[in-house]
Amino acid sequence: MQIKTITLKLSAVSLGALFFSGCLGTSFFSSLDNAQVYYPSNDFKSSPSSSGTKGTMKPYTINGKTYYPTVVAVGETADGIASWYGPGFHGKKTSNGETYNQNALTAAHKTLPMNTILKVTNLNNNRQVTVRVNDRGPFVNNRIIDLSKGAASQIDMIASGTAPVRLEVIGFGSSNSGNNIVHSNVNYGNSGEIANNGQIYEGGNFMVQIGAFKNPAGAQTIAARYKTYRTYSSTIRTSSVDGLNRVFLTGFRSEDEARDFAASGAFAGAFVVRE
């Protein structure tokens, strides 16, 4: 699909959000004076994606406005107004083909790559939730993100309908050959939500998660197997939040190197985080 005005068939969830009263808001994009084309703004220091062959990264047009999915880096932030969507869309298909679960910790965003993992902070009360982008929207002005009902509940914005939030990119999920999210990357629940607020590790250097185990012996076995893998080494981190023993490869010289490795397919669903 060429980068021009293109109409992409979106889900009933996304299109339905056009008529949802809670989905009015500010986008991260500014329009050209004489064109209905929206490009990334400086809120996220993003750039147009080169992944044009990936269906969820193709430009698409809604109500005469063209949106270009973008590439962002771990640690980038943006502030804006969040809304939420729920009962009217529960059980319908999202833009990436999943079945929408209003109770899962997911979100709709106009241009972030599918399966981007975001930490969302309600600036009114400092409550936080971690969500995974699995849908497109909201497609009206003055909204930065549409949260699921479950995510909105976590940061206490159900009653208000909207709230000022800060979004931070904390990682990137991936899918296996069946286009299913690989649950070992983040602590996902049975219905695709991120369980236990998706606790991951943050810091300065980048590493790649290759497994997560309830049983410490499982983590130790994998860590020993890949103690030295190519130029990388393994390490285990145990979360005090969910009790999972996560196995990481370390030694990446840059975020780009870590992301290239995660995308190489060496480990199904490899997931980039900051050490």
UniProtKB/Swiss-Prot annotation:
Lytic transglycosylase with a strong preference for naked glycan strands that lack stem peptides. Its main location: membrane. CDD domains: DPBB_RlpA-like. GO terms for molecular function: lytic endotransglycosylase activity; peptidoglycan binding. Residues 1-22 form the signal peptide. Residues 200-275 form the SPOR domain. It holds the Pfam family DPBB_1. A lipid is attached at C23 (N-palmitoyl cysteine). Its EC number is 4.2.2.-. One of its GO terms (cellular component) is plasma membrane. InterPro entries: RlpA, RlpA-like_DPBB, RlpA-like_sf, RplA, SPOR-like_dom, SPOR-like_sf. It is a lipid-anchor. Keywords: Cell membrane, Cell wall biogenesis/degradation, Lipoprotein, Lyase, Membrane, Palmitate, Signal. Belongs to the RlpA family. It comes from Campylobacter jejuni subsp. jejuni serotype O:2 (strain ATCC 700819 / NCTC 11168). A lipid is attached at C23 (S-diacylglycerol cysteine). It is found in: Cell membrane. GO terms for biological process: cell wall organization; peptidoglycan metabolic process. This is Endolytic peptidoglycan transglycosylase RlpA. NCBIfam families: rlpA.
